[in-house]
Amino acid sequence: MSKKIGIKENLYQFILLVVTNLFVGSMVGIERTVLPLLGEEQFGLASTSAALSFIISFGFSKAIVNYFAGQIADKFGRKRVLLLGWVVGLFVPILTIFAHAWWVIVFANILLGINQGLTWSMTVNMKIDISKANQRGTAVGLNEFAGYSGVAIMAAVSGYVASSYSLRPEPFYLGIGIVIIGILLSLIVKDTGQHLKIQIRDNATKNESINNLSSKEVFNLTTWKDKNLSSISFSGLATNLKDGMAWGLFPLYFTTVGLSVSQTGTIVAVYPAAWGFFQLFTGVLSDKVGRKKLITYGMWTQAFALWFILFVNSFSLWILGAILLGLGTAMVYPTLQAAIGDVASPNWRASSMGVYRFWRDSGYAFGALIAGIIADLLGVTWAIEIVALLPFLAGVYSRMRLDETLKTVAK
């Protein structure tokens, strides 16, 4: 039976992939509240930049794996790469539970980066494979909603478990269960290779040079040669640079101002919860109003939210700031990936997505590195304030350089 393209036509597969990414995100959520505090309290790391080294290792490993994941998936199939990612993920909670030194935590986060780079990349690409062109924003939005719902749920749960028991090992027992479920779901889901072939056939043009590009050509196009792809990549990097800072510094900032671990965990959870929730609507909205407006105003909303968090001084307003930060991130996250799908040919779309995700997730590492250095020199507040400048500038850059990539709106 021939395959058909469309979310409705592949609803069972689509739902399976959404649920799978819920568990992918949960792997990161376990760490968001616990690890920054673990570095200070159990391993006695006095330097902020040293304490954030686990994010740097995670960011760079995920970024590098993202780059190669697209190419590997184009050659060997999405499902195999998805399964490989989950197998690698099994070692993350085990190493964290038994770690006797901080370098073991850092190494575990290298493996977490590999896990996330392989699994999350594949759930995105597989959804785009089975979706129509005018459903890409919806597909990516639902994917990211599920993933960041997992992040939020586990950030809150791990914070609760850590405050009720201890920072280790109890929160990481959850991670072992998550990996087992992820492997089972990945065995059930079907590969989307046949759907991809249909898209390549339907997209075939006389200009073969556009459709068939080398890895180097795709990297150059996505990084700097194509003004749309490069603008998208810069906005992605700025978004996750801010997130790398938030991941590392928010727990330290909020506990410093007097909040409990449980309260801090709530704020740390609300941000990705809002991020995930609003993507239910922003992905669909980008399919209707276009990509450029959401990207530009989303970057500015992120910058404003960070400055707002520093300006206010109450738990309820910090919650509001976290919601605004999640909203701004949700405006750009599915939209940027949908825009890649608009511009790139199906033949090299996964590779281009890999390059974009390479630069985007390098932001985790750069954000933690820059924020850690500034925090050590000037303090945590200054680090948050300065990092907020980058998403603001990325919004200006998108406003000036990015075309509308959704063809129905661009016309």
Sequence positions of predicted segments:
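Structural signature of the two symmetry-related core transmembrane helices
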Residues: 80-94, 293-308
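Cytoplasmic helix-loop-helix junction between adjacent transmembrane helices
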Residues: 110-149, 338-339
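Helix-loop boundary and gating motifs at the non-cytosolic
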Residues: 9-59, 228-231, 235, 239-257
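Helix-breaking motifs and short loop linkers at transmembrane-helix boundaries and internal kinks
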Residues: 77, 98-103, 290, 311-313
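Residue-level signature of mid-helix packing/kink "hotspots" within the transmembrane helices
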Residues: 58-67, 151-152, 272-280, 364-365
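Helix-to-loop junctions at the C-terminal end of transmembrane segments
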Residues: 65-77, 162, 279-290, 375-376
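Symmetry-related core transmembrane helices of the 12-TM Major Facilitator Superfamily/SLC fold
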Residues: 170-187, 384-399
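Juxtamembrane intracellular "pre-TM" segments in multi-pass secondary transporters
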Residues: 1-11, 194-232
